[in-house]
Swiss-Prot record:
Designated name of the protein: NADH-quinone oxidoreductase subunit K
Lineage, top ranks: Bacteria, Bacillati, Actinomycetota, Actinomycetes, Pseudonocardiales
Gene: nuoK
Subunit-structure text: NDH-1 is composed of 14 different subunits. Subunits NuoA, H, J, K, L, M, N constitute the membrane sector of the complex.
Key word Lipid metabolism present: no
Originating species: Saccharopolyspora erythraea (strain ATCC 11635 / DSM 40517 / JCM 4748 / NBRC 13426 / NCIMB 8594 / NRRL 2338)
Catalysed reactions, semicolon-separated: a quinone + NADH + 5 H(+)(in) = a quinol + NAD(+) + 4 H(+)(out)
Length: 99
């Protein structure tokens, strides 16, 4: 497979994730769409690393995965806090945590 197909797939995945973030109101679905966008970026990094013949993109993709794992922990804790407070996982209720 040529790298063009991987880059097109990455752009498609990123676009699906971006539309999901902009359209959906459920915090868990928005969170999954952000993770989809991060995985699309990882695919792009690995593809460019393969094109250039270096491992720099693969190392960056590894660090993005590590940061994404930390993001999952913090994000789910925030979503659980919103749900416990408001009995809803809606993004619209996220600004109500300050009270």
């Amino acid at each position: 497979m040529t790298p063009t197909y991987y880059l097109l797939l990455s752009a498609l995945l990123f676009s699906i994730g971006a539309v999901g973030v902009l359209v959906r109101r459920n915090a868990i679905v928005v969170f999954m769409c952000v993770e989809l966008m991060l995985n699309a970026v990882n695919l792009t990094l690995v593809t460019f690393a393969r094109i250039n013949g270096s491992v720099d993109g693969q190392v960056m993709a590894f660090f993005v995965m590590v940061v994404a794992a930390a993001e999952v922990v913090v994000g789910l804790a925030i979503i659980m806090s919103i749900f416990r407070t408001r009995r809803s996982a809606s993004v619209d209720d996220a600004n109500l945590l300050k009270y």
